């Protein structure tokens, strides 16, 4: 598809350049690994805390955890992007919650390159018809096969 750009494997840094001054900030997109934590912000927080001085991005967008969230961590606008996969038996067994949906993000950048504002409009989708159909199948009587 011509409207998509492959940013690479696991993580990518994109320059956000101010249209008049040319000053830049960095946006990081990342698909990290690991399991889901009890606190929604824990995994992004630990990733951002692990950056060396001078390498933190201004904005970080995370996938993988099936969560939607905006939080500021150590001066970084951290966003969890949500997912397009609804909860399945595996997720239910692991006691996970999936946030199905995504976000529209608006950034306002100062002439010195600093990201002053980060506005996120989250859109969450709740389609329980599939899950309800699956659950209703389990309440039907079981019939023994004749021999």
Language model regions located:
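Active-site neighborhood of divalent metal-dependent phosphoester bond hydrolases
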Residues: 1-6
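Residues that act as N-cap/strand-start positions at coil-to-secondary-structure junctions
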Residues: 8-10, 99
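Conserved beta-sheet core of the metallophosphoesterase superfamily
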Residues: 24-28, 33-118
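A short C-terminal boundary segment appended to hydrolase-like catalytic domains
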Residues: 109-147
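Short acidic-hydrophobic surface loop/beta-edge motif
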Residues: 10-22, 71-73
């Amino acid at each position: 598809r011509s409207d998509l750009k492959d940013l690479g494997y696991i993580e990518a840094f994109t320059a956000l350049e101010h249209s008049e001054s040319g000053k830049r900030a960095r946006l990081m997109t990342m698909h990290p690994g690991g399991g889901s934590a009890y606190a929604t912000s824990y995994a992004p927080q630990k990733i951002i805390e692990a950056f060396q001085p001078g390498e933190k991005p201004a904005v970080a967008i995370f996938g993988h955890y099936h969560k939607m969230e905006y939080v500021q961590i150590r001066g970084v606008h951290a966003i969890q992007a949500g997912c397009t996969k609804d909860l399945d038996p595996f997720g239910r067994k692991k006691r996970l919650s999936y946030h199905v949906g995504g976000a529209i993000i608006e950034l306002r950048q100062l002439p010195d390159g600093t990201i002053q504002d980060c506005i996120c409009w989250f859109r969450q989708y709740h389609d329980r018809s599939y899950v309800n159909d699956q659950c209703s199948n389990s309440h039907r009587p079981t019939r023994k096969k004749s021999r």
